[in-house]
C-alpha cells in the first residue's frame, strides 16, 4: 500500500500520524533528530516539548479549554497522553515532559501502520500524499526549498508580534478614532498621553523584566525590528518620534495633538480584537499586563495574546492554503503546525489533527472536511487561510476574538464565553456526525 509521508515528528506531525494510523492507513514519519539536531531539543522523542510543560487551562469557558475539548472530540492522541502523564497545576493541564514525549512515541511505534524514519528531508516528495509539519525549527535546507516552492517573501524566520487586546476591555471614553492627517477611514483607535504619563511609561519600560532567549544567537533576527523596550532605552523621546508619534492626530477633546499616542489597529472584520501598533516586545507577560495597563484607555485591558519576539519559521499561509489545509498549487500536500502561522502547543497539534483527518479522507476518496469558524479549531484555520495584507499577518493562538460573534451581543463575559463554547461544541458534533469523522 502507498504510504502517507509526514515530514516532522513534532506535535502536529504526531497527531496527524495518529489520525491516519487509527484509520489503518500506512504512515512514514520523517524526523531528522537525532541525526540532525537543533539548539533546543534534548531528546530524540517525537512530540518533544521544548519550552513550557503546560498546555494551559482545561476549563471550557477559557479559549484554551474549548480548543482542548474540541480536540478531545476528534480523538486527540496528545490529550490522552497528557492525562496519563499529568502533574499538579491547578486548572491547567501540565505534564511530565519526558514521560509525555516518550509515551507518544511508544503509542505511535506500537501501531503496525506507523514507521519512523530518522533522516532529514530536504525537498518535498514528488509523489504521494504528504503532510509538512516541520515546525518553528525547520532545517535550513528544507526552509530553502520551501522558499523556492512558495516564494522568498512569504517565508519568515522569527515572530515580532505586538500584543492583541479584546475590544470590549478598552475604555472608549479615553480613546479616539482617527487616521493620521485625517486620511482614509478612521480605523485606528488612539490612546493619547500627556508628557507626565509618557515619561512614567518610558521609565517603566526601561526597568521592566524581559524574557531570556531559548535559542542561541536569536537576537540577530531582530536587528530590523527592535523591541519597544529597547527603543525606550535609546532616549526619552525615541518612542514619541517612532511608534508613539502623535503627528497628524488631533484629540477631539483638546483640539490638539497629544504629547504621545499609542495606536490600536483592528485585527479582524468584526473589530473584536485590536493590536498595539509597533509594540513588538520581549517583556515578560506579567510585565506587559502591568505596564501596558498604564496607557490611557487600557487600564482594564484584557489580552487575547501577549507580544512575543522569538525564532519561528512560518509562512504567509493565506496565499497558499485552502481551508482543508491543502496546498493550493498541489492538493496532495498538506501543511500543519506552527509553520502555517498558529502559535502554541495545542494550536499546532489541532492543525495536525485536521491535516491527518483530511489526508486520510483524500487517501480513501472521501470528501474533505472544513470546520466552521464557530469552532475554535475552525476559527484558527479560518485565520490562517483568510487573506489579509501580508504586513498584518502574524501567528495566532486560541482566543475568543477569532470566533464568529454570537447573533445577539452579550455583555456578561462568562455567559458569553459559555454560550460561544456550547455553540462551538454543538457545531463540531454536527460535522463529526455528518461526515462520520471518528468512524
Swiss-Prot record:
One of its GO terms (biological process) is tRNA wobble uridine modification. It is an enzyme of class 2 (transferase). One of its GO terms (cellular component) is cytosol. Keywords: Cytoplasm, FAD, Flavoprotein, Methyltransferase, NAD, NADP, Transferase, tRNA processing. SUPFAM superfamilies: FAD/NAD(P)-binding domain. Its cofactor is FAD. It is found in: Cytoplasm. It catalyses: uridine(54) in tRNA + (6R)-5,10-methylene-5,6,7,8-tetrahydrofolate + NADH + H(+) = 5-methyluridine(54) in tRNA + (6S)-5,6,7,8-tetrahydrofolate + NAD(+); uridine(54) in tRNA + (6R)-5,10-methylene-5,6,7,8-tetrahydrofolate + NADPH + H(+) = 5-methyluridine(54) in tRNA + (6S)-5,6,7,8-tetrahydrofolate + NADP(+). Gene3D superfamilies: FAD/NAD(P)-binding domain. One of its GO terms (molecular function) is tRNA (uracil(54)-C5)-methyltransferase activity, 5,10-methylenetetrahydrofolate-dependent. FAD binds at residues 8-13. Its EC number is 2.1.1.74. NCBIfam families: gid_trmFO, PRK05335.1. Catalyzes the folate-dependent formation of 5-methyl-uridine at position 54 (M-5-U54) in all tRNAs. HAMAP family: TrmFO. Belongs to the MnmG family. TrmFO subfamily. This is Methylenetetrahydrofolate--tRNA-(uracil-5-)-methyltransferase TrmFO. It comes from Dictyoglomus turgidum (strain DSM 6724 / Z-1310).
Amino acid at each position: 500500500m502507498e504510504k502517507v509521508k509526514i515530514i516532522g515528528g513534532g506535535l502536529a506531525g504526531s497527531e496527524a500520524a495518529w489520525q491516519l494510523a487509527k484509520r489503518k492507513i500506512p504512515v512514514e514519519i520523517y524526523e531528522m533528530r537525532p541525526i540532525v539536531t537543533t539548539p533546543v531539543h534534548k531528546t530524540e522523542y517525537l512530540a518533544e516539548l521544548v519550552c513550557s510543560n503546560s498546555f494551559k487551562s482545561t476549563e471550557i469557558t477559557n479559549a484554551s479549554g474549548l480548543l482542548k475539548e474540541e480536540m478531545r472530540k476528534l480523538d486527540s492522541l496528545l490529550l490522552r497522553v497528557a492525562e496519563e502523564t499529568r502533574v499538579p497545576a491547578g486548572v491547567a493541564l501540565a505534564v511530565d515532559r519526558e514521560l509525555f514525549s516518550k509515551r507518544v512515541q511508544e503509542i505511535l511505534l506500537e501501531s503496525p501502520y506507523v514507521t519512523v524514519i530518522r533522516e532529514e528531508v530536504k525537498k518535498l516528495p514528488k509523489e504521494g500524499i504528504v503532510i509538512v509539519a516541520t515546525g518553528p525549527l525547520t532545517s535550513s535546507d528544507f526552509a530553502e526549498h520551501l522558499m523556492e516552492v512558495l516564494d522568498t517573501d512569504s517565508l519568515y524566520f522569527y515572530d515580532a508580534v505586538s500584543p492583541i487586546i479584546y475590544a470590549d476591555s478598552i475604555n472608549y471614553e479615553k480613546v479616539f478614532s482617527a487616521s493620521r492627517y485625517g486620511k482614509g477611514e478612521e480605523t485606528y483607535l488612539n490612546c493619547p498621553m500627556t508628557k507626565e504619563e509618557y515619561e512614567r511609561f518610558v521609565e517603566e519600560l526601561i526597568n521592566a523584566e524581559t524574557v531570556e532567549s531559548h535559542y542561541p544567537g536569536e537576537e540577530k533576527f531582530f536587528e530590523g525590528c527592535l523591541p519597544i523596550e529597547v527603543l525606550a532605552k535609546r532616549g526619552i523621546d525615541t518612542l514619541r518620534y517612532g511608534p508613539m508619534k502623535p503627528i497628524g492626530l488631533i484629540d477631539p477633546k483638546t483640539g490638539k495633538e497629544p504629547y504621545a499616542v499609542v495606536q490600536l489597529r483592528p485585527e479582524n472584520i468584526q473589530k473584536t480584537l485590536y493590536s498595539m501598533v509597533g509594540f513588538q516586545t520581549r517583556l515578560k507577560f506579567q510585565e506587559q499586563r502591568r505596564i501596558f495597563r498604564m496607557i490611557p484607555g487600557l487600564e482594564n485591558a484584557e489580552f487575547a495574546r501577549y507580544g512575543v519576539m522569538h525564532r519561528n519559521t512560518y509562512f504567509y499561509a493565506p496565499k497558499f492554503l485552502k481551508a482543508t489545509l491543502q496546498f493550493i498549487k498541489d492538493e496532495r500536500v498538506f501543511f500543519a503546525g506552527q509553520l502555517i502561522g498558529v502559535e502554541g502547543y495545542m494550536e499546532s497539534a489541532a492543525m495536525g489533527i485536521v491535516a491527518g483527518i483530511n489526508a486520510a479522507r483524500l487517501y480513501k476518496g472521501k470528501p474533505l472536511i472544513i470546520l466552521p469558524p464557530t469552532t475554535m479549531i475552525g476559527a484558527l484555520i479560518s485565520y490562517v487561510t483568510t487573506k489579509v495584507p501580508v504586513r498584518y499577518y502574524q501567528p495566532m493562538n486560541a482566543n475568543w476574538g477569532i470566533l464568529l460573534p454570537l447573533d445577539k451581543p452579550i455583555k456578561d463575559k462568562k455567559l458569553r464565553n459559555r454560550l460561544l463554547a456550547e455553540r462551538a461544541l454543538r457545531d463540531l458534533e454536527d460535522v463529526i456526525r455528518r461526515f462520520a469523522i471518528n468512524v
